[in-house]
Amino acid sequence: MTPQDFYRTLEEDGFSLSSKQKEQFDTYFKLLVEWNTKINLTAITEENEVYLKHFYDSIAPILQGFLANEPIKLLDIGAGAGFPSLPMKILFPNLEVTIIDSLNKRISFLTLLAQELGLENVHFFHGRAEDFGQDKAFRGQFDAVTARAVARMQVLSELTIPFLKIRGKLIALKAQAADQELEEAKNALCLLFGKVIKNHSYQLPNGDSRFITIVEKKKETPNKYPRKAGLPNKKPL
């Protein structure tokens, strides 16, 4: 998917990018490739592949109608090189984006990236989701949490749901069908008062299958969740 293919596909979906937005995606790509020689950000560095498998894939929840251009508070867990939240932010500037990542070098990259792209209302924090999930400044503060290929739903639910407001939504982007994952996550979702409201499949323009699972938070998360760092992965609920 060339940049021109990317712009044209978005226009067909009703999103006509400004010259500024096109420049932001171009700068994003260049900085990603440059920094990838210093720290491991991605295995995908070829331009057409980045536009398809990072940029287009990241904004899929918007294209599929799961997010609007509103000043909601969105948290991205384990965003790595900023996916999916920063491409979303470029497309929908009204989003207020917070990223938590466990690697400080990635936070350094993201901070520079946001400055170079001129993004406002973006915040970056270094640390573990389990620790921030017990911090009152973060717990129960977000309208939406995104996670792209971070962990199986059984683990992901404990890492993300505590951050949501009641009726807030987890938007999980997956490369594989989530049916089996959701079956395994039934107990975790029950304990965390999360309800699956959508399990959506779609295709990238090249025909690759992708999946978006939407989980809504129904009640306050019990205080003991999330457990200490490492436990959700070691002993899933």
Swiss-Prot record:
It is found in: Cytoplasm. GO terms for molecular function: rRNA (guanine-N7-)-methyltransferase activity. Its main location: cytoplasm. It is an enzyme of class 2 (transferase). The keyword Cytoplasm applies. GO terms for cellular component: cytosol. It holds the Pfam family GidB. HAMAP family: 16SrRNA_methyltr_G (MF_00074). This is Ribosomal RNA small subunit methyltransferase G. It comes from Streptococcus pyogenes serotype M6 (strain ATCC BAA-946 / MGAS10394).
